[in-house]
A protein has these predicted regions:
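C-terminal functional regions that serve as terminal interaction/effector modules
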Residues: 5, 16-19, 186-196, 200, ...
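Short, low-complexity cationic-aromatic patches
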Residues: 2-7, 18-20, 58-66, 72, ...
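Core segments of cupin and vicinal oxygen chelate
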Residues: 2-51, 85, 95-101, 141-193, ...
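Short, structured motif recognition centered on aromatic/hydrophobic residues
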Residues: 9-12, 66-73, 114-117, 134-138, ...
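Short, structured interface segments
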Residues: 106-126
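A short, polar/charged loop-to-alpha-helix boundary motif
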Residues: 121-131, 267-269
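Vicinal oxygen chelate
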Residues: 18-20, 46-51, 69-110, 144, ...
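Conserved beta-strand in the GNAT
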Residues: 53-56, 105, 114-115, 195-199, ...
Length: 269
């Protein structure tokens, strides 16, 4: 398994009230298979025999039912210090996750929660950017003026606004959205090198919606995935629509966790 570059999204997991129901839902939607973790409080998810995510049983019913993303770091304590220096908060101090690695939880200045992962025996995803696996993440925030410099200073991201990419988005849903893509340090920023992004929570969203990271999974057929989600007991928050990079939908699983599916352009008919 290849090592992830510092600042790259390297892992995703979902916190659920009912772990077995989560297995049924995501197994039905993505074809995932599962292996129980130590203590049986979480399950690793596999696509085609390769590790793609984890499902975890919530330790406290008051915790949100949500997907979370983790960024790779070469030095988790240095990254924690940078987060504090640039206006973020540490929710969970670095702690060992068995022999797999060291993990921490943080929040950006707008309140969006994300994880840090310093690998040891487990690097992260064994499969991504293929159907049934992670392909993208973006943070939704009401404070882009604070959040953009935070991520660019903490992780060294270089940003590209959507209107700088050369795509004609005049007929796309994203044309109405202030959207910024992030590329890792050391590469030319742009769509070809982007590993994540930032969108803005506008007045079109519910006033009570907090800042959050939206996790995307690649699928071979976006419309079919949305239909299957409903058959499995989930719901469609945003029906399938076209963007410059494919066709996507925003969905909720049968316990309320939100995520997105993306049918990349090369898989469109």
């Amino acid at each position: 398994m290849a090592a992830f570059a510092h600042s790259a999204p390297c892992w995703a997991d979902v916190q659920l009230s009912d772990l077995e129901a989560g297995k049924r839902f995501y197994g039905g939607l993505f074809g995932w298979t599962f292996r129980a973790g130590d203590g049986m409080h979480f399950a690793d998810a596999f696509s085609g025999g390769r590790l793609v995510a984890a499902l975890a049983a919530k330790k406290d019913g008051r915790m949100p039912t949500t997907w979370g993303v983790y960024f790779a770091t070469d030095d988790i304590r240095a990254t924690v210090a940078a987060i504090r220096e640039h206006g973020g908060q540490i929710i969970t101090e670095p702690v060992r996750a068995g022999r797999a690695g060291i993990v921490a939880q943080a929040a950006d200045p707008g309140g969006a929660v994300f994880g840090l992962w310093q690998p040891e025996e487990r690097e992260g995803f064994e499969k991504q950017n293929e159907p049934g696996s992670f392909c993208w993440t973006e943070v939704y925030t009401r404070q882009p003026d604070r959040v953009d410099p935070f991520y660019e200073k903490v992780f060294g991201f270089r940003g590209t606004d959507l209107d700088e990419t050369g795509h004609d988005v005049s007929d796309d849903a994203e044309a109405l959205v202030d959207f910024r893509m992030w590329s890792p340090e050391g590469v030319e920023p742009g769509p070809d090198t982007a590993i994540g992004g930032r969108s803005v929570i506008t007045d079109a969203f519910p006033a009570e919606l907090p800042s959050y990271f939206l996790v995307y999974f690649a699928v071979a057929d976006c419309d079919a995935a949305a239909e299957l989600t409903m058959r499995l007991g989930g719901r469609v928050a945003q029906p399938p629509f076209d963007i410059p990079y494919g066709r996507m939908a925003v969905l909720h699983d049968d316990q309320g966790a939100v995520f997105a599916v993306l049918q990349p352009t090369e898989l469109l008919p």
